[in-house]
Amino acid sequence: MSARGEGAGQPSTSAQGQPAAPAPQKRGRGRPRKQQQEPTGEPSPKRPRGRPKGSKNKSPSKAAQKKAEATGEKRPRGRPRKWPQQVVQKKPAQEETEETSSQESAEED
Protein backbone atom coordinates (compact mmCIF):
# COMPACT_ATOMS: atom_id res chain seq x y z
CA MET A 1 0.00 0.00 0.00
CA SER A 2 2.83 2.44 0.80
CA ALA A 3 4.36 1.94 -2.69
CA ARG A 4 1.10 2.96 -4.29
CA GLY A 5 0.83 6.05 -2.12
CA GLU A 6 4.23 7.35 -3.24
CA GLY A 7 3.56 6.86 -6.96
CA ALA A 8 0.07 8.31 -6.84
CA GLY A 9 1.34 11.91 -6.64
CA GLN A 10 3.28 11.68 -9.93
CA PRO A 11 1.87 10.44 -13.24
CA SER A 12 3.85 7.50 -14.60
CA THR A 13 4.32 9.04 -18.10
CA SER A 14 6.11 12.18 -16.86
CA ALA A 15 8.35 10.17 -14.51
CA GLN A 16 9.69 8.10 -17.41
CA GLY A 17 10.05 11.12 -19.71
CA GLN A 18 8.46 9.34 -22.69
CA PRO A 19 5.13 10.45 -24.12
CA ALA A 20 2.62 7.61 -24.51
CA ALA A 21 1.53 8.65 -28.06
CA PRO A 22 4.25 7.09 -30.27
CA ALA A 23 3.75 3.34 -30.18
CA PRO A 24 6.44 0.94 -31.41
CA GLN A 25 4.11 -0.20 -34.20
CA LYS A 26 1.27 1.71 -35.81
CA ARG A 27 -1.97 -0.23 -35.69
CA GLY A 28 -4.32 -0.38 -38.65
CA ARG A 29 -8.02 0.26 -38.48
CA GLY A 30 -10.55 -2.43 -37.70
CA ARG A 31 -10.27 -5.68 -35.87
CA PRO A 32 -6.73 -7.00 -35.36
CA ARG A 33 -5.92 -10.20 -37.21
CA LYS A 34 -5.50 -13.45 -35.36
CA GLN A 35 -1.89 -14.42 -34.71
CA GLN A 36 -0.80 -17.57 -36.53
CA GLN A 37 -0.20 -20.32 -34.00
CA GLU A 38 2.69 -22.66 -34.66
CA PRO A 39 1.64 -26.32 -34.73
CA THR A 40 2.84 -28.26 -31.72
CA GLY A 41 3.10 -32.03 -31.90
CA GLU A 42 1.25 -34.21 -34.41
CA PRO A 43 -1.51 -32.63 -36.47
CA SER A 44 -4.83 -34.26 -35.66
CA PRO A 45 -6.54 -35.94 -38.64
CA LYS A 46 -9.58 -34.04 -39.90
CA ARG A 47 -12.89 -35.80 -39.44
CA PRO A 48 -15.05 -36.16 -42.54
CA ARG A 49 -18.14 -33.99 -42.69
CA GLY A 50 -21.60 -35.03 -43.79
CA ARG A 51 -23.28 -38.39 -44.09
CA PRO A 52 -21.21 -41.56 -43.62
CA LYS A 53 -20.60 -43.58 -46.79
CA GLY A 54 -22.62 -46.73 -46.08
CA SER A 55 -25.48 -45.14 -44.20
CA LYS A 56 -27.93 -45.00 -47.13
CA ASN A 57 -27.97 -48.77 -47.63
CA LYS A 58 -29.25 -49.51 -44.13
CA SER A 59 -32.93 -50.22 -43.58
CA PRO A 60 -34.79 -47.90 -41.20
CA SER A 61 -35.38 -49.05 -37.64
CA LYS A 62 -38.76 -50.31 -36.43
CA ALA A 63 -39.38 -47.15 -34.43
CA ALA A 64 -38.76 -45.01 -37.50
CA GLN A 65 -41.17 -47.12 -39.57
CA LYS A 66 -43.93 -46.75 -36.95
CA LYS A 67 -43.38 -43.02 -36.84
CA ALA A 68 -43.66 -42.78 -40.63
CA GLU A 69 -46.95 -44.68 -40.61
CA ALA A 70 -48.38 -42.61 -37.76
CA THR A 71 -47.84 -39.31 -39.54
CA GLY A 72 -50.61 -38.66 -42.00
CA GLU A 73 -50.41 -35.96 -44.60
CA LYS A 74 -46.99 -34.41 -45.05
CA ARG A 75 -47.16 -30.65 -44.72
CA PRO A 76 -44.62 -28.22 -46.09
CA ARG A 77 -42.08 -26.59 -43.82
CA GLY A 78 -42.31 -23.03 -42.61
CA ARG A 79 -45.22 -21.06 -41.30
CA PRO A 80 -48.28 -23.21 -40.63
CA ARG A 81 -51.16 -22.35 -42.94
CA LYS A 82 -54.87 -23.01 -42.59
CA TRP A 83 -55.81 -26.18 -44.41
CA PRO A 84 -59.40 -26.57 -45.69
CA GLN A 85 -59.62 -30.21 -44.50
CA GLN A 86 -59.60 -29.16 -40.85
CA VAL A 87 -63.01 -27.50 -41.21
CA VAL A 88 -64.53 -30.51 -43.03
CA GLN A 89 -63.46 -33.01 -40.35
CA LYS A 90 -65.39 -31.27 -37.54
CA LYS A 91 -68.94 -32.17 -36.51
CA PRO A 92 -71.84 -30.66 -38.55
CA ALA A 93 -73.30 -28.90 -35.49
CA GLN A 94 -70.06 -27.01 -34.96
CA GLU A 95 -69.72 -26.12 -38.65
CA GLU A 96 -72.86 -23.98 -38.57
CA THR A 97 -71.57 -21.92 -35.67
CA GLU A 98 -68.16 -21.57 -37.30
CA GLU A 99 -69.62 -20.41 -40.60
CA THR A 100 -71.37 -17.50 -38.94
CA SER A 101 -68.25 -16.57 -36.97
CA SER A 102 -66.08 -16.78 -40.10
CA GLN A 103 -68.45 -14.45 -41.96
CA GLU A 104 -68.28 -11.94 -39.13
CA SER A 105 -64.49 -12.00 -39.09
CA ALA A 106 -64.41 -11.53 -42.88
CA GLU A 107 -66.54 -8.40 -42.58
CA GLU A 108 -64.16 -6.90 -40.02
CA ASP A 109 -61.20 -7.13 -42.41
From Swiss-Prot:
Compartments reported by the entry: Nucleus
UniProt protein name: High mobility group protein HMGI-C
Subunit relationships: Interacts with E4F1. Interacts with NEK2.
In-chain residues carrying the UniProt-annotated modification Phosphothreonine: T40
Compositional bias annotation for Basic residues: 46-56
Organismal lineage: Eukaryota, Metazoa, Chordata, Craniata, Vertebrata
GO cellular component: a single term: protein-DNA complex
DNA-binding residues: 24-34, 44-54, 71-82
Biased composition (Low complexity): 15-25
Entry GO MF terms: 5'-deoxyribose-5-phosphate lyase activity; C2H2 zinc finger domain binding; cAMP response element binding; DNA binding, bending; DNA-(apurinic or apyrimidinic site) endonuclease activity; enzyme binding; MH1 domain binding; MH2 domain binding
Family: Belongs to the HMGA family.
GO biological process: adrenal gland development; astrocyte differentiation; base-excision repair; cell division; cell proliferation in forebrain; chondrocyte differentiation; chondrocyte proliferation; chromatin organization
Disease implicated: Silver-Russell syndrome 5: A form of Silver-Russell syndrome, a clinically heterogeneous condition characterized by severe intrauterine growth retardation, poor postnatal growth, craniofacial features such as a triangular shaped face and a broad forehead, body asymmetry, and a variety of minor malformations. The phenotypic expression changes during childhood and adolescence, with the facial features and asymmetry usually becoming more subtle with age. SRS5 inheritance is autosomal dominant.
Post-translational note: Regulated by cell cycle-dependent phosphorylation which alters its DNA binding affinity. Phosphorylated by NEK2.
Keywords: Acetylation, Cell cycle, Cell division, Chromosomal rearrangement, Disease variant, DNA condensation, DNA-binding, Dwarfism, Growth regulation, Mitosis, Nucleus, Phosphoprotein, Proto-oncogene, Repeat, Transcription, Transcription regulation
Modified residues (Phosphoserine): S44, S101, S105
Residues covered by region (Interaction with E4F1): 44-63
Function statement: Functions as a transcriptional regulator. Functions in cell cycle regulation through CCNA2. Plays an important role in chromosome condensation during the meiotic G2/M transition of spermatocytes. Plays a role in postnatal myogenesis, is involved in satellite cell activation. Positively regulates IGF2 expression through PLAG1 and in a PLAG1-independent manner.
Pfam family, one: AT_hook
Acidic residues biased stretches: 95-109
InterPro entries in alphabetical order: AT_hook_DNA-bd_motif, HMGA, HMGI/Y_DNA-bd_CS
Residue ranges, annotated region (Disordered): 1-109
Modified residues (N-acetylserine): S2
Biased composition range(s): Basic and acidic residues: 66-75
Classification via PANTHER family: HIGH MOBILITY GROUP PROTEIN HMGI-C, HIGH MOBILITY GROUP PROTEINS HMG-A AND C
